[in-house]
């Protein structure tokens, strides 16, 4: 399996996003999106997935963080798809349950090339919460947008379920950590499947 790296540059009237990743890294990251809490979540995603990430986003945060958050996830998903290539030799499936104090999240990932997202279990008010200190806040509803944008651009099937949780920060962080750990397993090389695509179809990109 060759070293799996990718670089994506994406520019629109709403944002400019530059993403570089290394799937076989050590979870090192340099993240700047203009939304502090989102930087924290992406740093967490990098650390616990083992994917090195360098992400720089500038956007119309004077409106709010929505465009910058979503567009960053789109570019990150595109980078994942590029780095995974034909997916030869990967494990393909990953499943993780991660706690953060009172919060508990489960994420199941299939790197199948068939995008799908199912999110459930969050408290009713989570979508309306704004998280962050000074500067641009992160609205709780953006977690679904991130998962959807990431999955549909990377070709992932993602099932994310909050099993318990009260604090909005803890809920988001448990969810991102669960995604990270599930991804770490799914993209890892499977020595028993070296050089082969883990599918009876013989391909995961069609």
Swiss-Prot record:
GO biological process, one term: L-histidine biosynthetic process
Superkingdom of the organism of origin: Bacteria
GO cellular component: cytoplasm
Record key words, sorted: Amino-acid biosynthesis, Cytoplasm, Histidine biosynthesis, Lyase
Molecular function per GO: imidazoleglycerol-phosphate dehydratase activity
Main localization of the protein described in the UniProt heading: cytoplasm
Pathway: Amino-acid biosynthesis; L-histidine biosynthesis; L-histidine from 5-phospho-alpha-D-ribose 1-diphosphate: step 6/9
Compartment(s) of residence: Cytoplasm
EC number: 4.2.1.19
Enzyme class: lyase
Catalytic activity: D-erythro-1-(imidazol-4-yl)glycerol 3-phosphate = 3-(imidazol-4-yl)-2-oxopropyl phosphate + H2O
NCBIfam families xrefs: PRK00951.1-6 (NF002110), PRK00951.2-4 (NF002114)
Family of the protein in this entry: Belongs to the imidazoleglycerol-phosphate dehydratase family.
Descriptive protein name: Imidazoleglycerol-phosphate dehydratase
Species, as recorded: Cutibacterium acnes (strain DSM 16379 / KPA171202)
Organism phylogeny: Bacteria, Bacillati, Actinomycetota, Actinomycetes, Propionibacteriales
């Amino acid at each position: 399996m060759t070293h799996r790296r990718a670089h994506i540059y994406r520019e629109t009237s709403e944002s400019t996003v530059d993403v570089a990743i290394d799937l076989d890294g050590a979870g090192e990251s340099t993240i700047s999106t203009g939304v502090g809490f989102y930087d924290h979540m992406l740093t967490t995603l990098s650390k616990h997935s083992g994917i090195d990430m360098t992400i720089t986003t500038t956007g119309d945060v004077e409106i709010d963080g929505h465009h910058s958050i979503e567009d960053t996830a789109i570019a990150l998903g595109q980078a994942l798809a590029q780095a995974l290539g034909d997916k030869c030799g990967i494990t393909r499936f990953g499943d993780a349950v991660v706690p953060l104090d009172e919060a508990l999240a489960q994420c199941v990932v299939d790197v199948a090339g068939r995008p799908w997202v199912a999110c459930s279990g969050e408290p009713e008010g989570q979508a309306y919460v704004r998280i962050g200190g000074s500067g641009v806040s992160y609205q709780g509803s953006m977690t679904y947008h991130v998962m959807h944008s990431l999955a549909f651009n990377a070709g992932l099937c993602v099932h994310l379920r909050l099993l318990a949780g009260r604090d909005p920060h803890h809920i988001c962080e448990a969810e991102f950590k669960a995604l990270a750990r599930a991804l770490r397993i799914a993209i890892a090389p499977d020595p028993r499947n070296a050089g082969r695509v883990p599918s009876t179809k013989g391909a995961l990109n069609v």
